[in-house]
């Protein structure tokens, strides 16, 4: 089973090793979550300013955030199922702020890689339909995140 992952670091500030680790982590998460073989996801690393613009334009919040996901396979009300649904799905896009990743790693006292992995998994779970709008959803999603990261070996220490 293999996830097709396109990772672009627009900031040129994240090491090739860290980007490769994100790819391995997302492959691991996809396998654990039973994601269809050859499903596609993109990960883009941006600056605080870039993610602030995206957050403002798409969420109405004029402030930087750590990660934003755009699921492409969600069907809303009154939407017709896409023809060719037997094709591997394009799950969507995960956009991560390198600046916020660094800030939060320092704030929480763990490595940049742990924070980057956390944000990648958080965004990936959103693409799979997980959310944290209610207490129950939050508990389910955050527990899933922790389990995936711990099992992969990217713990908070």
UniProtKB/Swiss-Prot annotation:
What does the record give as cofactor? Answer: Zn(2+)
Among the GO molecular function terms of this UniProt record, one is: metalloendopeptidase activity
Q: How is the cofactor bound?
A: Binds 1 zinc ion.
Query: Chloroplast: is it a keyword of this entry?
Result: no
Q: Name one GO cellular component term.
A: cytoplasm
Annotated GO biological process: rRNA processing
Respond yes or no to whether keyword Metal-binding is given for this record. yes
The UniProt family comment states: Belongs to the endoribonuclease YbeY family.
SUPFAM superfamilies, alphabetized: Metalloproteases ('zincins'), catalytic domain
EC code: 3.1.-.-
Q: Which InterPro entries does this UniProt record tie to the protein?
A: MetalPrtase_cat_dom_sf_prd, YbeY, YbeY_CS
Bilayer-spanning residue ranges: none
The UniProt keywords, alphabetically, are: Cytoplasm, Endonuclease, Hydrolase, Metal-binding, Nuclease, Ribosome biogenesis, rRNA processing, Zinc
Explain the purpose of this protein.
Single strand-specific metallo-endoribonuclease involved in late-stage 70S ribosome quality control and in maturation of the 3' terminus of the 16S rRNA.
Give me the residues that bind Zn(2+), please: 122, 126, 132
Organism this protein belongs to: Bacillus velezensis (strain DSM 23117 / BGSC 10A6 / LMG 26770 / FZB42)
What protein am I looking at? Endoribonuclease YbeY
Q: Name one Pfam family in it.
A: YbeY
Q: According to its UniProt record, where is this protein located? A: Cytoplasm
């Amino acid at each position: 089973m293999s996830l097709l992952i396109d990772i672009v670091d627009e900031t040129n500030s994240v090491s090739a090793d860290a980007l490769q680790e994100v790819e391995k982590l997302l492959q691991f998460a996809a396998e654990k979550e039973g994601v269809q073989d050859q499903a596609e996801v993109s990960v883009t690393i941006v600056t605080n300013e870039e993610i602030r613009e995206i957050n403002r334009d798409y969420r109405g919040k004029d402030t930087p955030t750590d990660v934003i996901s755009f699921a492409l396979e969600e069907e809303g009300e009154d939407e017709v199922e896409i023809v060719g649904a037997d094709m591997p799905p394009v799950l969507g896009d995960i956009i991560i702020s390198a600046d916020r990743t660094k800030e939060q790693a320092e704030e929480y006292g763990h490595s940049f890689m742990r924070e980057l992995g956390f944000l990648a998994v958080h965004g990936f779970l959103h693409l799979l339909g997980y959310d944290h709008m209610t207490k129950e959803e939050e508990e389910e999603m955050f527990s899933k995140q922790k389990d995936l990261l711990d099992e992969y070996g990217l713990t908070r220490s």
